[in-house]
Each structure stands twice: as structure tokens, then as C-alpha cells.
Amino acid sequence: MAHKKGASSSRNGRDSNAQRLGVKRFGGQVVKAGEILVRQRGTHFHPGVNVGRGGDDTLFATAPGAVEFGTKRGRKYVNIVRTVRSEA
């Protein structure tokens, strides 16, 4: 057993909290306006139709509808497809 702590062990012992990033609403799910779709750092997913982008690159729905993921010219996009309600 060492009687001294060692070179850097006394400077260790910190860890940061997880950032909870990732896709929050998946393809086909119905969302309301304002719901967060993707939390990300940088634009891994780009905003498409009826999707806005926040200051921290979070994607959110700007209109109600179903979530749709797709690619265009090598970029991944998230769209909101408006669902047609039948008045019954």
C-alpha cells in the first residue's frame, strides 16, 4: 500500500452530468406544436417542413402532425406531416 496518494489521484474524482441528448419523438408519432423532437449538439438532423431549430440546435415542431425522418442530398431531415382530421 502506498503511503502517499500518487501523482494525480488527488486531482481526479469529478464527472459531469449527462446532457440527455437524442431523438425524443420517433417516426410516425403524432406531436403537438412546440414539442421537442431532437436534442443535439450541432446539426446532425436538419429542420424540415413544420420544424424549427432552437439556439442550441434543438429541433421542435411548429405545427401539429406526425413525425417523419428522411434524407435529401445526403442530409438527414425531420419533417412534420400535417394529419387530416375527418369531422365525424
Swiss-Prot record:
Keywords: Ribonucleoprotein, Ribosomal protein. One of its GO terms (cellular component) is cytosolic large ribosomal subunit. GO terms for biological process: translation. GO terms for molecular function: structural constituent of ribosome. Residues 7-19 have a biased composition (Polar residues). Transmembrane segments: none annotated. Residues 1-22 are annotated as: Disordered. Disulfide bonds: none annotated. The keyword Ribosomal protein applies. Belongs to the bacterial ribosomal protein bL27 family. This is Large ribosomal subunit protein bL27. The gene is rpmA.
